[in-house]
Amino acid sequence: MEITASLVKELRERTGAGMMECKKALVENAGDIDAAAEWLRKSGLAKADKKADRVAAEGRIATAQAGGKAVLVEVNSETDFVAKDENFLAFTEVVANAALNSDAADAEALKSVKLDSGETIEERRAAVIAKVGENLQVRRLVRIDSANNVAAYVHGGRIGVLVELKGGDIELARGIAMHIAAMNPPHVKASDVPAEFVAKEKEIELAKMSEKDKAKPAEILEKIISGKISKIVNEVTLYGQPYVLNTDQTVEQAVKAAGADVIGFQRLAVGEGIEKVVEDYAAEVMKQAGLA
């Protein structure tokens, strides 16, 4: 069968692969476009395997929501350049929507979720790797499914937050989500702070005190320490922090004024916890030249 330009173009549009790759696939499969597409998919999987050991620490946080059901996904790339690529961005949206419409509990379970095209998320990932030339990872998935107010907020594609708010309204929930994105509180309220953390901070504050202060009566010393610990606890709790949308009140005051309560939240930031590889090209060149 003759391999025409229109056939190559059709396969390219269908798979997103390069023109020369599409032509080769058609030649290898006697012009059968379905077989050629499958051949490219298999080729894409091979390329994905070669890139699997590269560190993917850039990327994007994407969200999808339907009423009180919302998800955040983190999809990683190796470079910020690819994180802005239209193929990568489209893939993150596909992943987020697939997560929303599935019952996958985590990123590992999400890999086997099937798309309308019949592909799994993992197969689509491999196909996108073939297009962009970098290792990509669907790293994390978090979700909230509730009858309460649920807000999803993504800042610049780098930080994403889900908030569940009992009472109040969706506008307040979104404001709280924006605050969490900006301030990154580890806990909702003081009662959520581990006792071990409080004990350690007391120990640190006591060690920092002067001998003169340590000599004060026990009840006075306890008040001084308690005041310092209260300030620290406020810093690490959502409720204790000044509300970024109105710094005249704390988040707790804003929430309670609306007769509401924050049930919980999820926050993801691109690449957190991933150790990035720092390339020392000068040292690499010297090593290759036998100078190091």
UniProtKB/Swiss-Prot annotation:
Function: Associates with the EF-Tu.GDP complex and induces the exchange of GDP to GTP. It remains bound to the aminoacyl-tRNA.EF-Tu.GTP complex up to the GTP hydrolysis stage on the ribosome.
Residue numbers spanned by region Involved in Mg(2+) ion dislocation from EF-Tu: 79-82
Database matches in PROSITE patterns: EF_TS_1 (PS01126), EF_TS_2 (PS01127)
Primary site of residence: cytoplasm
One MF term in the entry's GO annotations: translation elongation factor activity
A single Gene Ontology CC term: cytoplasm
Keywords of this entry: Cytoplasm, Elongation factor, Protein biosynthesis
Annotated family: Belongs to the EF-Ts family.
Transmembrane segments: none
Alphabetized HAMAP family for the sequence: EF_Ts (MF_00050)
Origin superkingdom: Bacteria
Annotated localization: Cytoplasm
Protein name: Elongation factor Ts
